[in-house]
């Protein structure tokens, strides 16, 4: 069973644990999916990953899942010229999160956009009760091409 939340929440979640391994695992899943669809692999953008992590922290503090309202500002210093996009959500595993993105048409279209070149990834595990669930992963993925 795959569990994920890609919508708004209501409760409070004060504590989050970061894991540097989350970013590389998400990147591997995204690139494996893109490879399976004959698309080029994305490269990690460290500054964009910092922005993604900042947005994830903001969502956790607000205990709500939402796209960044300032995506244009976030991307203003990046070399993007064709597309800028975001995917946000939470799930009990990284696989469940990726699975949910791939089965939701808007997020799937983003992940499989052939014009994308770079990705920023911010994932945190929240160890307290919250809208998504105790020990669930909250994530922001930012893209440009």
Predicted features, each with a name:
Residues 49-99, 111:
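Short, surface-exposed glycine/acidic/tryptophan-bearing loops
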Residues 37, 60, 82-83, 106, ...:
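Residue-level signal for pocket-adjacent positions within structured domains
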Residues 90-145:
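Disulfide-stabilized extracellular recognition modules
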Residues 36-50, 63-74, 108-123:
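Surface-exposed patches in mature extracellular/periplasmic domains of secreted proteins
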Residues 14-18:
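Sec/Tat signal peptide C-region and signal peptidase I cleavage site
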Residues 19-62:
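A short alpha-helix/helix-coil micro-patch that ends at or immediately precedes a cysteine
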Residues 2-11:
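Bacterial N-terminal signal peptides
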């Amino acid at each position: 069973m795959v569990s994920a939340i890609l919508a708004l929440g209501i409760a409070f979640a004060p504590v989050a644990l970061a894991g540097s391994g989350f970013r590389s695992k998400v990147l591997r899943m995204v690139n494996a999916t893109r490879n399976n669809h004959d698309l080029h692999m994305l490269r990690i953008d460290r500054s964009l990953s910092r922005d993604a992590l900042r947005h994830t922290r903001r969502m956790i503090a607000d205990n709500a899942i939402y796209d960044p309202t300032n995506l244009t500002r976030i991307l203003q210093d990046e070399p993007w010229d064709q597309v800028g996009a975001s995917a946000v959500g939470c799930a009990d595993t990284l696989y469940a999160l990726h699975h949910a993105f791939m089965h939701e048409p808007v997020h799937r279209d983003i992940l499989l956009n052939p014009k994308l070149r770079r990705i920023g990834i911010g994932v945190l595990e929240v160890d307290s009760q919250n809208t998504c669930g105790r020990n669930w992963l909250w994530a922001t993925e930012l893209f440009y091409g």
